[in-house]
Amino acid sequence: MIKVHYQDDQENLMEACSGVMNTLIETDRGVKSAFSDLISREVMEQFRPDKDHFLIHSTAMGDQETYGPNKNGDGWPKEALARKHQTFVTNGHFFREHRNRDPKLKIGDIKYAAYSPVSEGGMGRVELLKWGHRKLAEEEYEMAKEGKELCFSMSARVPLDVCSCCEHKAKSASEYC
């Protein structure tokens, strides 16, 4: 089963981020400071893009215990985000408009992922550093330079879906209660 998550579907997280989920990081003159408590200046410098790419900082998703489910009623438990956030880097790519089946269609790559647990004073969310290819993601780059908000979706293969009301487990939509 594939579950889709849009950044702006988690209203409480959007509010906590003041509506800004993606930010273009200009690195032409070096990285002057950390972007967030989770992504340090050193990490940003380590993932500084080459001349063919630009850098986007994204707040990807928040855990359901802190921010609740998204508009579809889907949520990701903090334990799952703590354990699996690196799969954004190992399995993920940067695509346009949910064209995410063929890696040949990617417009960039996810270079870094981190999760900050609330129990350790964090925000209970996953943050990413993404490289967008300046030519393949030209539209996104221009929008980001103009300060326009970008919104990306994420998807994941999950073995089953669990109903938030009765905890019924379904392996496909046809098994939903």
Each language-model region and where it sits:
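Signature of dsDNA virion morphogenesis modules
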Residues: M1-C177
